[in-house]
Amino acid sequence: YKLDTTTGVEITNQLDHANGGLQYLSRSDWTGTWPTVDGEVSDQISTWGNPINGTDASGKAASYTYRKTISKEDLAKLDSFDSLNTTDPSTLTDELVYGKDNGLGLIDMRGLDYNDPKWNDLLDQLTPSDYQTLITQSGYGTAAIKSVDKPSTTDRDAATGLVNYGVDASGNFYFKGNITHCGVIVLAQTYNDDLATHYGENIGDESYYLDVDGWYAPAVNMHRTAFSGRNSEYYSEDPFIGGHIASLECEGVASRGMYVFVKHYAINDQEDHRGDREGQYSIATFLNEQAAREIYLKPFEMCVKSDKVEMNYAKDNGDGTYSNATTEIPSVTGIMTSFNRVGYTWAGGNYNMITGLLRNEWGFHGFIITDNANTGVFMDAGQMIQAGADGKLTNLPTGARYTFNKNDVSDYHYGREAVHNILYTIA
C-alpha cells in the first residue's frame, strides 16, 4: 500500500536507521544475499554450530565464534540523546504562555476532539511547575494539577490484571489488593472474541473497586523464541493473533471508562541488559523495515486502529446549561515504550518510531509513557518529548533527571504537546 488504509497518510520508510548497515536475506536475490561470516575469529569455542575454523589446545579441529568490535562512531550513537527529530529548534516560534485564567477545568474537555481549539485555552492555564510534574513524575499515576482542576490519577501494572501495591513517594509501602486473571497465552489460544472482550470488561469493572484509572497493559510483544523475556505477558508468536485478541481486550477495558497503555513499544525482546543502572546502555536491536512492520509492530498497529467505544459526558450547551451526551473515543489512548533501542536510538526517544509511525502514520492521539524510568537512568526526558512521547514512568524525585526550562522555546513547544497528550487521555 502507498497510503495507510485507516488514516490515508502516505507510507514511507521509518526504520532505515535501524538496519545496522547489514545485508538482509531476500527472496529477490536468494543466493546473493545469503549470510556469510562477518568479523574476526575469537578464542571462544562456538556452541551454535559455526563451521570448523581452527584447532583447540589439543590440536583437534574446532569451531570458534566470530566477533566484531563496535566503531567509535557507532559507540557515540549509543551514548547520544539524539531523538532523530530533524526540526531546527531555531524555527520554533511558539509564544510562551503560562498561568492564564481562562476559567476552564479538565472536566470541560471531556468528550471534545483532540484538535478542539478549546484545548489551547486550557493549556494556557498551566504553569511551568505543571509541565515539570506531568513530564517527569507520571509513574503509576499522575498528580493533581490545580491550575486546570485536574484530579490525581492511579495507574497500575500487570498483564493479567491489576497489581495494586507499591511504594509511595514518601517511601511507604501500601497494599490495596490484587486481581489476576488467566494468562494471556491461554486467552489467545481460545480464539474466542467474546471471551477476549469480556476479559477486558472484567478488568475495567474491577478498576472501580480498586480506584484505578489506567492499566499498564496489554503487552503485545512477540514470542520470538521460547527464551525471550516476559513471554508469559505476551500472547503469541503470531502478530495477528496477538494483535486481534489484545485489541478486543482494549475495547472491553475502554468500554468501562478505563484507559490502557499498550506495551512495550517496540521490539522489546529480552529483560537482560536493559540499562537499569548508571553506566549501562540498553540493548540495541537491529532489524529491517519489513520485519518490523509485518511482525513486531503489527500488534501495536492493530490495537491503535481497533474499534472505538462510546463515552458519556456532560455537554456544554453554551447557555450555562449542560446536557447528557455520548461520543465515540479510541479504545487505545495510551502506549508504553520500551527499554531497548531500535537501531542505536532508545525506543522511548525515537522520533521515527513515535511521531513518524505511531502518531503521523497510524493517527494515534494520547499519552505515551516510558517503561520504568526510576531505574532506566538513560531515559532522557528532553529526548523523549522531542521524539513525541510525553511522560516518564517515575514516582521518585530522583527519577526526573530533567528540569523543564520555562524560557526555552523548544522545551515549551514539545512540552506543551506532551501535556496535551497526557491530559487528553485522562479527560
Regions found by a protein language model. Give the residues of each.
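Glycoside hydrolase catalytic-domain context in secreted enzymes
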Residues: Y1-A427
